[in-house]
Structure formats: structure tokens, C-alpha cells
Amino acid sequence: MPVDLDNSSTVSGDASVSSTGNQNLTPKSVGKKKRNLPGMPDPDAEVIALSPKTLMATNRFVCEICNKGFQRDQNLQLHRRGHNLPWKLRQRSTKEVRKKVYVCPVSGCVHHDPSRALGDLTGIKKHFCRKHGEKKWKCEKCSKKYAVQSDWKAHSKICGTKEYKCDCGTLFSRRDSFITHRAFCDALAEESAKNHTQSKKLYPETVTRKNPEIEQKSPAAVESSPSLPPSSPPSVAIAPAPAISVETESVKIISSSVLPIQNSPESQENNNHPEVIIEEASRTIGFNVSSSDLSNDHSNNNGGYAGLFVSSTASPSLYASSTASPSLFAPSSSMEPISLCLSTNPSLFGPTIRDPPHFLTPLPPQPAMSATALLQKAAQMGSTGSGGSLLRGLGIVSTTSSSMELSNHDALSLAPGLGLGLPCSSGGSGSGLKELMMGNSSVFGPKQTTLDFLGLGRAVGNGGNTGGGLSALLTSIGGGGGIDLFGSGEFSGKDIGRSS
């Protein structure tokens, strides 16, 4: 017993000494310099390099009674006090203890360098386990693994209780995942902003400017606005009047059958200028028309000349115009299906256009009629109409041979007569037709050596026949030697001989 007391007194004395020593050292600790940052040890510290086995070892100090292990000897001595076993604590010597630092045994690690050594044994052990050891502990909620048990316990307490929300709306339960995602999200947003800035510099109008037409026209205005009908040009020469002349109708027929009229802005511009359209028609047929002739002929209300050019009973093929404008140049309702044309040459009017997209096709040749049929038709038309309509009913169309060309001479302009070869008088109103009916026309005069009366050739020897007027005309149609019908010699004299 006295030994135990001595031991106890000794221990208590040591404890008291140590306690008094601690009390004496406490004022001195106030004047110590601040701790260095981790990895920046004191240059005078002792550098200790431990083996990986020593760093990974746990419970180096084991209790012989309960076999409980401890990492430090002091912890084991304190544990022994619980078993009423003798225990001994190391006394702090009065000498200044040299500070110890620990380096990582892995050569490639940052903390392998003595200048980056760690000043705590526990710190170097945890570092080695975290960076170079095996991760043994796994979280049941997020399946994250840990090499240090204390880290795993700390994570298990807060796992699932705190959420990290990114600006894009994504939720994260782990802070490290949130940090990684946020870095990627910020980089993506910065790249998008950069591309937008570049596109704005390259195409400023596309990005900033709106279409003024769209702004001016609202959807309601677009829906309420009625669809405009396709614009079709009105009548060619003059606006329709109650007493319309035959010449105006003939000009309409010529323009509709010769010109490829389309529903275009050009036709709309020329709808108030008949001279332009007639000039185009004359160029297509081969006539020479001047503006003065057009103005004079336009004021002429007697339609005899134009009536001889085109028959009022022409077939619908003569009125073939663009189907894009059906209301343009509409034919009369009293038209008959067949024409009294003496010409079989389809190249006089040129190809017509029925539909703008289709190709041009020539008109089919009209069947020839005998002289008897022509006379009967002339008698019928003469009984129902005036002189102008009689000649217009004949439907005599001029055609010449390939060797004969139309003259461009001013004295024999073919535009006012439209194929008759009658001289143009600037101030006259139908005088040419009157002279023809009375027999005083220069057509039958001695100066006219050759008469090309719409395809009815006349020999030089017959130029002296000046009497008769209309009877001479019918006589020249019906018989007599030296008449070359159509001027091309396609039919013999037997076909046109008078039947008595």
C-alpha cells in the first residue's frame, strides 16, 4: 500500500507539476508568432518522412485489456486510467521542442517537397488517404465514396438536406456537382453572348431593324383588304359608244388577232394610246403606218376601208387573243362560224397567241370558195346591210406572191385603206370608198397598170377599164382572162370561172 501511495503521490505530484508548468507557460504562449499557412512550414522545423504503411496504419497503440486501438500513445494512457491501470503522461520539458513537419511519401505529390510539408501528423495521414488511398466508405443516398471515415460521416449528415440551384433551373444536392455544372453553364452563356454580339455587328439590320411593310400592314388590315381582280386593259382605240364605227371594231379585231396581247404592265400603259398598238400591229403584218395617218384614219367614221380588210363573219380563230384576258376584244354575237376569205395564206396575220405559256402555232388555212358562192354571199349581205357592210361581208383579204412586196411610199400607204391600195387623203371622210362605188376611183384609172386588189391580180392590159364602179369590181371577181386569183397561181381559171 505505501508503494501505491507513493506511486499515487508521485503521479499526483507529476500532475501538479505539469499543471503548474502549464500555468507558467500560458503567459508565454501569448507572445508566440502566428501559425504559418498549410504547406508553408517553418524553415527551422524538423522534416519527417513516414512510410505509406505507417501513414495507413490505424490503432498503433492497443489496450491489453480490451484490445482497443489508439493512434496516439497519450490517448492510450488516458484510456488506461479507466481500467485503474497505472498510466503515465509525458511531461513537457522546459527545453524548447523543435517543431516537426511531415512530407508525403509519393514523389509526384505536391506535398513531397519539404517546402510544402504538412505540420500535422493527422493532416498528412488524411491527405495520403484522400489523394493516394482507397475509398472505402460510400454514401447510400448519392453513392459518393470517401477514403476518410470522418469525411463520410460529415457528408452523410448533410446529404439531401441542402439543394444547390443553378440559374438555368437545374437542382443539385452535391456542392461539387453544382460547381462543375455552373462553370460549364457560365462558359456556355458567355459563348452565346459572344456569338450574338458578332452576328449583331455583321447583320445590324437583320437583328435590330424590323420590316416597315409588315409594321404598316397589320394582320387585320390584310384580312379586310379585298383581293384585287386581275387588271385587264380596256378597249384599244376608243371607249365604247352607242354609235360605234365599223373601223373601230376592225381595229380591235386586228389588234386582238395579230398582237400577242398579254396581261402585262406594258399593255396597261398602252391602253390609252391606240397609235402605239396599231404601230405594233403594222410591224407584225408588214404595213407602214404613220402617226398622221392614224390620226386621220381615226377621225374617219366611214368604215368601208377597214370593212374590206376583215370580214364581220370571220371565224373565231381570227379573234384568237390571250386567254388571260377574256374580256379583251370580245367578238360580236352575230358572227358566223366561217369566213369569206379569199386568202389561204396563214402568214398574213402571223401566229397568234391563245395562251401565253404555249408555243406559237400558225392559223389553219381557210377553205377556198368558188366565185358563184362569193356572188351569192355578196347578194345576201347587200340586201341586209349598207355598202360598207357589203364590202365588209365579202371578207376579201389581200395576199400577194412571195416576189411582190408592200411599198412604203407615202402616196400609196396601205394603212388607211387596209389592203385596198387606195391613196390616203388627210382631210377626207370616206372619199375613197365613194369614188370606188361611183366608178371614179383611181384604182380603175389608166395610170394604175397593175391592181393588187386583195389577192386579185390584174394584168397590165386590163388597166384601161375605168367604167362600171362596183360592176367592174364584180366583173373582175367573176371572170375575164388575165385575172390571176390569189396572185400565187394556186388555183386555175376553171375554179373561178363564172357559172351562167
Curated annotation (Swiss-Prot):
Its main location: nucleus. Residues 174-186 are annotated as: SHR-binding. This is Zinc finger protein ENHYDROUS. Residues 1-42, 196-236 are annotated as: Disordered. PANTHER family: SERINE/THREONINE-PROTEIN KINASE RIO (PTHR10593), ZINC FINGER PROTEIN ENHYDROUS (PTHR10593:SF248). Keywords: DNA-binding, Gibberellin signaling pathway, Metal-binding, Nucleus, Phosphoprotein, Repeat, Transcription, Transcription regulation, Zinc, Zinc-finger. Residues 8-21 have a biased composition (Low complexity). GO terms for biological process: gibberellic acid mediated signaling pathway; regulation of DNA-templated transcription; regulation of gibberellic acid mediated signaling pathway; regulation of seed germination; seed maturation. SMART domains: ZnF_C2H2 (SM00355). It comes from Arabidopsis thaliana. Interacts with the DELLA proteins (e.g. GAI/RGA2, RGA, RGL1, RGL2 and RGLG3), acting as coactivators.
